[in-house]
Amino acid sequence: MGAAIAKKLSGPNIEIVIHYNKSKSKAESLKKDLNKSGTKIYLVKADLTKENEIEKMLKFSKSKLKYFDCLINNASLFENDKLENFTTKSWESHLKANLKAPALLSKGFAKNARGKNNNIINIIDQRVFKLTPYFFSYTLSKTGLYTLTKTSAMSLAPNIRVNGIAPGPTIKNKRQSDKHFKKQYMATPLKKQTDVQEICNAVDFFIKNRSITGQVLAIDSGQNLNWQTPDIMGGKEWKN
């Protein structure tokens, strides 16, 4: 998703810092591809669970860019656990990568934002609108990011706008089979997979609409609206 967003924002005389951790070859390939459009790309490696590496990434970005005008917090850790079996390691890893890192990056961005249209856009998850007991640590980190989006929009106005996007079934995760992923998106009201380009279009929409801040837009084929939950299906309200 990050690569698709970078492509959407690329163009002549545009400068973008792209972060990667373990996907160096993919990052280098993306850089080569975007260079063709006249975009200047700077790659930086960092583990977002480590505060010192986040600081190095910010320092690197300041050395390459004249100023900051857009931050996309897209990187995310996504592992399954529940209240009954979560570990301290899982808890801390999710909170560091999915909440602490965006907060620190937003703090650094705010200190160096010099553009005329400054934006922070956080990629969240439709789960924040429809809570379940699954993906416990992940969900807590994303609900925290939802709150960060709202509160930072208050703190950073009027110079910086902060918004969020809450995707639904967009990209099959590494543990899913094609069959399971299809079952997931076919269970949404619109019965369709969310296209990555729709996420990119939403990023572009937020950047261009200067009267919007503090909003979180669900792009999830209506997944957060699902009302046919097990309690309803097994109760008197359910009718064939």
Residue ranges and their predicted role:
Residues 119-157, 169-170, 223:
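Catalytic loop of short-chain dehydrogenase/reductase
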Residues 82-83, 90-95, 184:
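Substrate-binding pocket helix/loop in short-chain dehydrogenase/reductase
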Residues 196-219, 224-225:
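C-terminal substrate-recognition "lid" of short-chain dehydrogenase/reductases
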Residues 74-79, 222:
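Conserved NAD(P)H cofactor-binding loop of Rossmann-fold oxidoreductase domains
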Residues 157-161, 213-215:
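Short, small/polar-rich loop/turn modules that mediate ligand/substrate recognition or access, typified
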Residues 1-17:
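Canonical Rossmann dinucleotide-binding motif of NAD(H)/NADP(H)-dependent dehydrogenases/reductases
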Residues 14-28:
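Conserved glycine-rich Rossmann-like NAD(P)H-binding loop of the short-chain dehydrogenase/reductase
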